[in-house]
Amino acid sequence: MNIKVAIVGASGYAGGEILRLLLQHPLYLSGQLSIGALMGSSTVGQTVSELMPHLPELSDRVVEPTDVETLKSHDVVFLALPHGFSAEIAQQLPAEITVIDCAADFRLKDQKDWDAYYGGKHAGSWPYGIPEMPGHRDLIASSKRIAVPGCFPTGATLALLPAIAAHIIEPDVSVVSITGVSGAGKKASVAMLGAETMGSLKAYNVAGKHRHTPEISQNLSEYADQKIVVSFTPVLAPLPRGILTTATAKLTSGITLDEIREIYLNAYENEPFVHILPSGQQPQTQAVVGSNMCHIQVDADDNSKKLVVTSAIDNLTKGTAGAAVQCMNLSLGVSETSGLPCGGVAP
């Protein structure tokens, strides 16, 4: 095996995290995978040492302009770009190249959802990159075009999917996700300045306005008898990375907490990157930083008769780059866990 990988948008947070993971991948360490073109736009001509000093193995590599002809000489192409740019590049690449898109361009199936939340030409949808969703692992493994999920939908979907599939909650769910600032990307903005974010929490794009809302609904509705209505509220926190999600929904019956836990334990029994915590222990972002894990806890509110599920992921790893590498592994036919850390970084 001799796999040559390119990254478009290599100097962004997602691109840099993909590089970090590839550098510890067994295929790279054994010489079976090489890191080819590192492409960008605003950082063209700068070295990895300048942009990402935490990756000394690539310190002398230079970011080059995005060029489709150069990409055609690669086996795997990661697109780590803002939405709207991936589709134009992807349509010019040969079908035999594995293209893994970290943007939103190919996530949504419904043209109306795309028009309402993104606008512009809808490029269609690709196999969706959450392998833990029943049926998706095989689709990913057999595909050369894969859409990496959004970070918020990853935490919310994994939190609610077993309950939806078991039909134990009503089709109206509430999701509140607290996120670190790296989710906004590297582009400079006043709202992301330290003076604006440190010591403060702020909700944004509330009341169904966030672009990840239809993606969460799409994922959950796939396993329900009807469309799942999602009320999604993101909250910005003064953290570099991490997402803590609290999802609630009305229980449909008098099911016990022990029975709910059993549903979740069975659903994720064979999933290497999902961990159901012991009773009474709550997920925390620190425990998953730098890892491809999702930590989950389930509970039942006796007062409101609601299911309460909390989940924690690293938005840059399981929420983006880790999912991308996980999908690459499946597409290449190697171990799904290759190069993906399960342990977080603490303190």
UniProtKB/Swiss-Prot annotation:
Its main location: cytoplasm. Catalyzes the NADPH-dependent reduction of N-acetyl-5-glutamyl phosphate to yield N-acetyl-L-glutamate 5-semialdehyde. The active site is at C151. It comes from the Bacteria. This is N-acetyl-gamma-glutamyl-phosphate reductase. It catalyses: N-acetyl-L-glutamate 5-semialdehyde + phosphate + NADP(+) = N-acetyl-L-glutamyl 5-phosphate + NADPH + H(+). Disulfide bonds: none annotated. It is found in: Cytoplasm. It is an enzyme of class 1 (oxidoreductase). Pathway: Amino-acid biosynthesis; L-arginine biosynthesis; N(2)-acetyl-L-ornithine from L-glutamate: step 3/4. The gene is argC. Its EC number is 1.2.1.38. The keyword Amino-acid biosynthesis applies. Keywords: Amino-acid biosynthesis, Arginine biosynthesis, Cytoplasm, NADP, Oxidoreductase. SUPFAM superfamilies: Glyceraldehyde-3-phosphate dehydrogenase-like, C-terminal domain (SSF55347), NAD(P)-binding Rossmann-fold domains (SSF51735).
